[in-house]
Amino acid sequence: SIADILDDLDKEIMCRSIILYSEGKNFCAGADFSKSNFINGQNIYENLYKQALRIFKSSKPIIAIIQGAAIGGGLGLALSADFRITCKEARFSANFGKLGFHQGFGISVTLPRIIGNQQAKLLLLTSRRINGEEAYKIGLADIITDNNLLMEKAEELANEINTSGPLGIKAIRNTLNDGLVEEISNAVVKEANEQNRLRNTKDFKEGINASIKRREAKFIGK
């Protein structure tokens, strides 16, 4: 898993920063809601977020390359990085409301921390999808470039970080992130509880069916 790899890299003295990226057209398009075990599984969210929490405990600066979609939990993964490099074709969305659901992966903490509470509310309550240019404008992405230059720009940033003293970088990052892991740890418990509650509602089932069939959901508030 990603968390296992990050744990291993934390032990590597020669590793001073990490580039997080995916192969293919998307960074991470979120959960596959067509899988029945997602809906019926017990404690699936608690187990998932325990693993996610490990990512936030990494001691090395993480640079995420966001191409294509970063949707739902995929957005949460992108937000776990220290920096995000993207292109105009990328798509970002906290689409939980459109599913009759609740955000997870610590997004309750990371999204407002990065773009501010009002912008976070706007994205979460509307479930709107924004492109890379819009993400850059609101601070969701730190660098925007052409799709074919994403890795080059990520390596440039990593090399810039790597020229600084590793002990100093670790100390600076620890101070800036002071209390973040604890805050996210508390948030994911609340997120998981809300997700477990909402997954048994008619609205959630309607939201999933509408998403799969690519139609507008008809929510009834039950």
Predicted regions and their residues:
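Acidic, divalent-metal-coordinating active-site segment for phosphoryl/phosphodiester hydrolysis
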Residues: 128-134
